[in-house]
Amino acid sequence: MSKHITEEQRYAISMMLQIPMSKKAIAEAIGVDKSTVYREIKRNCDARSGSYSMELAQRKADRRKQQKHRKEVLTPAMRKRIIKLLKKGFSPEQIVGRSRLEGIAMVSHETIYRWIWEDKRRGGKLHKYLRRQGRRYAKRGSKNAGRGFIPGRVDIDERPEIVELKERFGDLEIDTIIGKNHKGAILTINDRATSRVWIRKLSGKEAIPVAKIAVWALRKVKNLIHTITADNGKEFAKHEEIAQKLEIKFYFCKPYHSWERGANENTNGLIRQYIPKGKDFSEVTNKQIKWIENKLNNRPRKRLGYLTPNEKFKQIINQNSVAFAS
């Protein structure tokens, strides 16, 4: 089946939506896959009303086609902004997304990447501001290090389904990153809905200091927290103490199911942009840790519509305040 919609098919979609017919039935009627119809309506409907008309849809499709074949011009103002945001730790995708969110003209992220690599070929250094993708780091030495039976462990299967929706603030994920030769450790906590992160240097990798630092780090948002999810490391053996002092529920992933804490794994990767693999964490200061935390909480995220975690946090809190008042 074709993935491209013709002008005649757009007219048919417009008419059938008015009947109304389901998107699946429309797809069968015009001979395309239902995903093609869903994508067509989503891309070419009216942004404000959500309604679909053949005329508007065709104009949008024609404009998109023209832009695709038009060479993008990287203006001096764009170059200046790109360099500024690269130095702040933004990726090309974040530069484009944030610029469009703020109504600032910007080329595509593909064009930015091409410009960066052209700069590299000329001996430039812009590429050094890009994150290194695909790098793996050892958090606890061997695969089985730090694992064992945790008394009172509550499995992730018991966690409320609402946590999966990522709609409310206060469903957190927690982890530790261990430095070179097991020297020093860092505690990372992040919120699933907003990507807001708390990073703290640990005085030790044992369960008692981990619990103490976790409670201290979250004291200001204690009344907003619902759950915390961790892996099965022994450093979280004092989970009941954390749960009691924060008045929340504490859950554990299944062994070696790191994807069940996907947001936290991603956050740890972002931290590695600033603290590379092989770094002795005992050399990292609390001031540096706070600087990294501030950077990540004020960096736009694609999954947040290029809002920053702090902006998304304020948005959710404000929405909840309005709902409560109503």
UniProtKB/Swiss-Prot annotation:
InterPro entries: Homeodomain-like_sf, Integrase_cat-core, IS30-like_HTH, RNaseH-like_sf, RNaseH_sf, Transposase-Integrase, Transposase_IS30-like, Transposase_IS30_CS. It comes from the Bacteria. Keywords: DNA recombination, DNA-binding, Plasmid, Transposable element, Transposition. Belongs to the transposase IS30 family. It comes from Bacteroides fragilis. One of its GO terms (cellular component) is cytosol. It holds the Pfam family HTH_38. Coiled coil: none annotated. Required for the transposition of the insertion element. One of its GO terms (molecular function) is DNA binding. This is Transposase for insertion sequence element IS4351. One of its GO terms (biological process) is DNA integration. Residues 156-317 form the Integrase catalytic domain.
